[in-house]
Amino acid sequence: MNEVFLTPKEIVVVGAGMVAHRFVESLISRADTPMHVTVIGDEARRPYDRVGLTGFFSGATPEDLELDPSVFDDFRVRFMADDRVLRIDRSARTVTTRSRKSIPYDTLVLATGSYAAKVAVDGADLPGCFVYRTLEDVHSLKEFVSARSRMLGRPLRGAVIGGGLLGLEAAGALQGMDVEATVVQYSDRLMSAQLDSAGGGMLKRLLEARGISVRTQSVSYTH
């Protein structure tokens, strides 16, 4: 009987977050499908649980937050950390990375996720202003709060711009470091993409009962 050897399909995944991890996990569960999967992430670590970032402030390690590492131990998967796709050539079906690697693909998956946008106001790049998205972000925030509070000899005050899930997580993290936290939200309620007015109002009262100030329908500026 003649054996048929199928050419492995080349799959490139741009992004190494939770969605990319789940996608690759699903792919490699199909043991009968020949494939090579290349995952390109711009952080110098494997995918981790961003929703659990606040745990870092209470003693969780990067390893505690890491998603199932066995996904990237599969022989069909190549993980490229600390790199970034700079160019996609759809005609040649290749991607070019910051490290000047050209990687061919049969299927290209963009799983870059969201990004933490800095507020477009003067002073947003000054020391003490942070975004809250990566382990490096929260590590820098923790070090700054510790050093600054020692220097001043008192607890700090902090503002969180954005009342979504990560913003509220950030406010909780600040409070856990004895920072007087205020959440500033542009819309009329917290988590406006998930909650109606009643739910947003209830959440606001719960946070205020915990000592976190909330300002809705507010704009941001620095001085």
Predicted regions and their residues:
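Core beta-strand elements of the Rossmann-like FAD/NAD(P) dinucleotide-binding domain
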Residues: 101-107
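Glycine-rich dinucleotide-binding loop and its adjacent helix/turn
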Residues: 112-177
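Conserved small/polar residues in nucleotide/adenosyl-binding loops
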Residues: 221-223
